[in-house]
Amino acid sequence: MTENSAPAAKPRRSKASKKSTDHPKYSDMILDAVQAEKSRSGSSRQSIQKYIKNNYTVGENADSQIKLSIKRLVTSGTLKQTKGVGASGSFRLAKADEVKKPAKKPKKEIKKAVSPKKAAKPKKAAKSPAKAKKPKVAEKKVKKAPKKKPAPSPRKAKKTKTVRAKPVWASKAKKAKPSKPKAKASPKKSGRKK
């Protein structure tokens, strides 16, 4: 039984090698298809598949391979997705400057994937803005509370004014006493005028 399984694996490998010689890499074929279409909005996955099937001899699993290679090209930055999400939507070639920048980014992404601790930190950072939002709500409540307090506080102030008014009357009475001698002095002046 082991002898039968070993020879079965060898022909599969030879078929795979034959397929690879029939056509170039899927990424190269996709780039050719996008360049051939030259549409401003970008070329769709369906149009890319049609172009590849018409111009190259491809196997039955070509559609799934095209999807995977499109996703790889988008993540690497060689293709830019204009519409849709994932492998669906429209794609166009990225400019030379855009291609160079994303080419450096995948290396950093690989490092992040290796260290899951770094990936956990952004999650904490995402939680912290939510915490920051909660204190803002609390601050609004605090601000509202003082607004309610000033309305009753003038009433209290009025009560205190009435209490203070009594000493004011006493001070007025004291001021009234010195004014009496002035009144006495004023009749003398009137007498002199006569």
Curated annotation (Swiss-Prot):
Biased amino acid composition, Basic residues: 102-164, 172-194
SS bonds (residue pairs): none
Pfam families attached to this UniProt entry: Linker_histone
Alphabetical list of Gene3D superfamilies matching this protein: Winged helix-like DNA-binding domain superfamily/Winged helix DNA-binding domain (1.10.10.10)
Region (Disordered): 1-29, 96-194
Subcellular location: Nucleus; Chromosome
A GO term, aspect molecular function: nucleosomal DNA binding
Top-level taxonomic group: Eukaryota
TM segment ranges: none
Main location: nucleus
Database matches in PROSITE patterns: H15
Every H15 domain range: 22-95
One example of a Gene Ontology biological process annotation: nucleosome assembly
Cellular component GO terms, alphabetical: nucleosome; nucleus
Similarity section: Belongs to the histone H1/H5 family.
Purpose of the protein: Histones H1 are necessary for the condensation of nucleosome chains into higher-order structures. The histones H1.0 are found in cells that are in terminal stages of differentiation or that have low rates of cell division.
Name the record gives this protein: Histone H1.0-A
Lineage of the species this protein comes from: Eukaryota, Metazoa, Chordata, Craniata, Vertebrata
Designated gene of the protein: h1-0-a
